[in-house]
Amino acid sequence: AQIGRTEALNEAVEANGWNLLAQQTGEFTQAKGQEVMESMLKQYDNINVVYCENDNEAFGAIDAIEAAGKTVGSDIANGEIMVISFDTTHAGLQDVLDGKIECDVECNPLHGPRAEELIKKLEAGEDIDKLNYVDEEIFAHDDTVKSVKATNSLDEEKDFDVTPLTQDILDKRAY
């Protein structure tokens, strides 16, 4: 997943002409995410967006941003720093509701049960589709962005809906 997330960022930077100030791994931990963000804040005074490859890194980045007296949020024109993350842990989605993470892209933990279901079908002699997917969602703090265009693992470009997160949606999630 990490390789795909990094490649997607690099492709978006190139396609949109964005200025990527720096790129460093947070090693998927809150502590390292905080350490990296503290370093970035000392090196750069014009950070607009922080792209974290999981929620733990985002939590650390948010801690560092707030400790530096800066504000996380979507109003980058007025100095806020937007945080984007992946995984959609319960705590990550709570940060989406609270406006600390602007967008959180799901990495569904239900792949295991889906694989088990497919194995049982095969063992029972049933046919299954060659390709099987577990639904995943993109959650945002508000409804500013309705969908995003991305290329899937089959190299097909498609639109993915962005769901504005509500407390009701968060409360009904199984994980």
Q: PLM features: residue spans?
A:
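Short, surface-exposed alpha-helical segments at coil->helix boundaries
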Residues: 2-10
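Hydrophobic alpha-helical
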Residues: 9, 26-94, 116
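Hinge/cleft segment of the Venus flytrap/periplasmic-binding protein
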Residues: 11-13, 107, 111-175
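Short beta-strand elements in bilobed, periplasmic/extracellular small-molecule ligand-binding domains
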Residues: 12-30
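Local beta-strand N-terminus motif with an aromatic residue
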Residues: 20, 46-47, 101
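Conserved beta-strand scaffold positions in the cores of enzyme catalytic domains, especially
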Residues: 20-23, 83, 104, 138
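Short beta-strand elements at the ligand-binding edges of bilobed clamshell
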Residues: 23, 98-109
